[in-house]
Amino acid sequence: MNMNSVNETTYPVLSAITGRWSPYRFLDQPVGNHELCCCLEAARWASSSYNDQPWFWVVAKKEEQQRFEVMVRCLLEPNRRWAATAGVLLLSVMRTSLKHNHQPNPVALHDLGQASAHLALQASELGLQVHQMGGINRSFTRHTLAIPEGFEPCTISAIGYPDLGDPQTQEDREYASRQAASRRRKDLVSCVFGGSWGETAEAVTKTV
């Protein structure tokens, strides 16, 4: 994907959505605290069941060398190699039970995902990009970052300014090729049903 590219949508959506993508290469440019907090602010205003807000984050900025290196080690290979070029690594953590009754929260992961989407779209609006990774060592992450019982480490997001320059190494060329690849999403008719599973939804087959 290049700087002037946008995601091709069937229907008009927000520019932050059409401009969002997941880089493998980042510029050696710090992410300011203000910009990072804007992204986290967007995340915390996501909706959640019972307003439970089951989301938590652990942040490591690249200039915080020791913390950043620890967060890099929480990743699985090959994510470590490219994610280490980002300005920020952000671990998302989910509380698994509801605050008001201490019962399991069956939609905690949904709510954390919604907050994560808010964060990624706010980043896109600011000229940043976010690459979210499920490839983390959860047991190592839990132990190293002292995550207590009742909380689950979920993903680590690489946040920064995407590098769209000419690659200098073979590995960099491979990452650049991934970035330049066309992006596709399945059609609405294949994932939106009407009435019952597999039944065509008239709303997505007829344009009003």
Residue ranges and their predicted role:
Residues 1-208:
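Acidic, surface-exposed loops and disordered segments
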